[in-house]
Amino acid sequence: MVYIGLSNHMKSSLSQVLKMELQQNGWRNPKKAQSTVGHCLDRLVWIAVVMMLWVCKVDLHAQPEIRVDVLLNAQSNASFWMHPRVGMVPHDQDHPMAVMTLQETDREGTHMYHGLSTMVWDSRDKKWSSPQRDSALARRVDAQGLIEVFVDATPSWHSKTGKILLTGATFWLDPQLKKHLPDGGSDVAYSVLDLQNLAWSPWSKLELPSEPKFHFARAGCTQRVDLPDGDILLPIYFGGKGNDSRHKAAVARCRFDGNVLSYLEHGNELSIEVVRGFVEPSLCLFQGRYLLTLRNDLKPYVAWSMDGLHFSKPQVWRFDDGSELESYNTQQHWLVLPDACYLLYTRRGLDNDDIFRHRSPLMMSRVDSTTLQLMKSTERQVLPKLKDGFGNFGVCQVSENETWVTAGRLRAKPGEGSVYRARILW
């Protein structure tokens, strides 16, 4: 018999079943053998179905149910909400809950962020609290009236300490210019949530080596990986002069004791001589390899590593038909399941030439972990096409059967949806 597409182990198993049936049911008798073969084929069909389902269990994730809702509407002519990202207190804890940080942003000016706000989803009543500002995450004003603000933040559960650790970056803003300082510095910033009081610690700065290249250093909009010993692999990017300088990306190994985040080392520095270089890197661990996706002004890139610190030369993101992803100047993030890995992104070619930087709809595709290409046939829309688009979004694994993707709608007007959530049900 020929078993198309089955492993040697499966072929052997099917052959053994057929042999046993023929031996037990009289294969020497032609009439009986004819009946036995039919019976065997029935058995083989069922076994083949089970084995095919086992082989294709990853493909069962290809068409999840996606439900989109609006968590917040814009309420002011002066501002809208951006950078909504969720950290999940796991269900094996006494009080599982989701904690979202988000940021009110002035409609006038560029990067005119206010202090971070927090919303909490209680697993008992399944409701969200209204956004609350915390003085610990507020803007800080220096003697010259310049504003330093904690931005681009991502909350994530740290299992070793049982804390939600919020990581991001700082921006220096000039209220007179209504924009960030062109040559202003930046630091990797963090805060820790007290789960009992739902209060954040005053935001602090990660101490990096005293080198000029770290004058502008950030962990903005990044996804990190926590190691079994509690150490953290935190993607960062840095450039000497400011936001508009050329940046390099690397992964920093940090230690977190539940209160203080400390730098230990960082791996090889990834660079590209194209516009602002590599920014907003996000990291994941899938099937024993660390994958790093990188934003660039013109194209997105991906690199891999076995130790989470030393990465391959970045390659342009492509689909498995060889075509480029056609995303640009916008972050990408990972969605990782035990047996499948997805990339979330925005791109050209979706009847969206009227959208700023083609930042909607928000899409996802499964990653071929061997080639590091995206499987075009698995591409799905996660969030719809909307005027002005998304771009600044987060991904949170709520449970083994549910993933949330949260995004802020650029320049939403009063009454319009400002914070969107996609519930991906596996």
Residue ranges, per PLM feature:
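Serine residues within intrinsically disordered or low-complexity segments
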Residues: 7, 12-15, 35
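Residue-level detector of intrinsically disordered terminal segments
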Residues: 9, 19, 50-51
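Extreme N-terminal basic, low-complexity initiation segments
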Residues: 2-6
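Bacterial N-terminal signal peptides that target proteins for export
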Residues: 18-47
